[in-house]
């Protein structure tokens, strides 16, 4: 199941961009047995393979096509739909563009691949969307839970529904929010608040579960509630304003260990049953000496009592811990002369900006270790609109010969992953409008800064 697109939301006549790169069959045979492949959102693709990106919690975006080129670069482009001359075009599942009714009888070439999901006894296909009942116990009357399935994991969003102007709204399968009759064909380009974008504080939480980036079934979830990419320097999560006019997404990943799907929400962050965390008070920051635990849907907090006597003579106070620890328990800080941020290794980020005849080519590059190479993300911007982006890779030696790059910051692999995922979303979002702010906010995701009182 997917979001339907309506042609009247677009302002220009669109022509199909169905072929990103013509690859000769002979060349394909030459690389078939080579080690060349592309990596996009942690998934490997063979040379010549095409796919639609997956955006949480909307599912597969059929209006963006990605291709793995022969040199291992990922090329993504929007599909531009032609204008139709029939009065009532219809939308076909798994396709981007609407069709005239007389042309709608054809086979769908796209195949859904990916692991299915199980939620509350129901099996959902990869990319399928559905509505969850009883997931958020403390939701407002105008909020609902929208979920989707991706590679065996369930992604859910607490969505604040926009105010409706009609007297008799109707339900549609693509959204948990009711809509006015005639608005059932939801467009991707709805109100800005209803567009999912990755935040800078995706890892800015304090629980005893490992950070979620592998999308494994046992992983925890992360709260998202931002109308645009926030700066990496702002790490506070805020619950949605139920009075706002546009929809809002608070995204979580359901822990498959707890099939009931009940969660606790604390300070804008979502925790599953049994998960523990230290509360974050605005005036004091993280309170290490108070421990909260999610019990089904209720928070149970208690004070941590430190021992009166320690096995060592001179226990030390360690940042981020409530009780003192003995010196032999203090973790070593030797990091092999590498730069670290909050215990995570950082990598240099480079930037190059070239402007000519009203067109700006902006390149963001990062140095990776596995494999040791430089990954460069290239944006083509014309009059503030992101027209095209692609990814290229080169060796470190080749990169060092380029004179026009300068280092702008250092970042972690997790922040670089957020940046990479955000490109596909911004490309879709900024199809026909100026997105200077969104692009700048996306770059800010790469900048690192400790939160209040130096906590990570």
UniProtKB/Swiss-Prot annotation:
<feature type="glycosylation site" description="N-linked (GlcNAc...) asparagine">
    <location>
        <position position="120"/>
    </location>
</feature>
<feature type="signal peptide">
    <location>
        <begin position="1"/>
        <end position="28"/>
    </location>
</feature>
<feature type="domain" description="VWFC 3">
    <location>
        <begin position="262"/>
        <end position="327"/>
    </location>
</feature>
<keyword id="KW-0732">Signal</keyword>
<keyword id="KW-0964">Secreted</keyword>
<feature type="domain" description="VWFC 1">
    <location>
        <begin position="36"/>
        <end position="101"/>
    </location>
</feature>
<dbReference type="Pfam" id="PF19548">
    <property type="entry name" value="CHRDL_1_2_C"/>
</dbReference>
<dbReference type="GO" id="GO:0030154">
    <property type="term" value="P:cell differentiation"/>
</dbReference>
<keyword id="KW-0677">Repeat</keyword>
<keyword id="KW-0217">Developmental protein</keyword>
<feature type="short sequence motif" description="Cell attachment site">
    <location>
        <begin position="181"/>
        <end position="183"/>
    </location>
</feature>
<dbReference type="InterPro" id="IPR045716">
    <property type="entry name" value="CHRDL_1/2_C"/>
</dbReference>
<protein>
    <recommendedName>
        <fullName>Chordin-like protein 1</fullName>
    </recommendedName>
</protein>
<dbReference type="Pfam" id="PF00093">
    <property type="entry name" value="VWC"/>
</dbReference>
<dbReference type="GO" id="GO:0005576">
    <property type="term" value="C:extracellular region"/>
</dbReference>
<dbReference type="InterPro" id="IPR001007">
    <property type="entry name" value="VWF_dom"/>
</dbReference>
<feature type="glycosylation site" description="N-linked (GlcNAc...) asparagine">
    <location>
        <position position="295"/>
    </location>
</feature>
<dbReference type="InterPro" id="IPR045717">
    <property type="entry name" value="CHRDL1/2"/>
</dbReference>
<dbReference type="GO" id="GO:0036122">
    <property type="term" value="F:BMP binding"/>
</dbReference>
<dbReference type="GO" id="GO:0030514">
    <property type="term" value="P:negative regulation of BMP signaling pathway"/>
</dbReference>
<keyword id="KW-0325">Glycoprotein</keyword>
<comment type="function">
    <text>Seems to antagonize the function of BMP4 by binding to it and preventing its interaction with receptors.</text>
</comment>
<feature type="domain" description="VWFC 2">
    <location>
        <begin position="115"/>
        <end position="181"/>
    </location>
</feature>
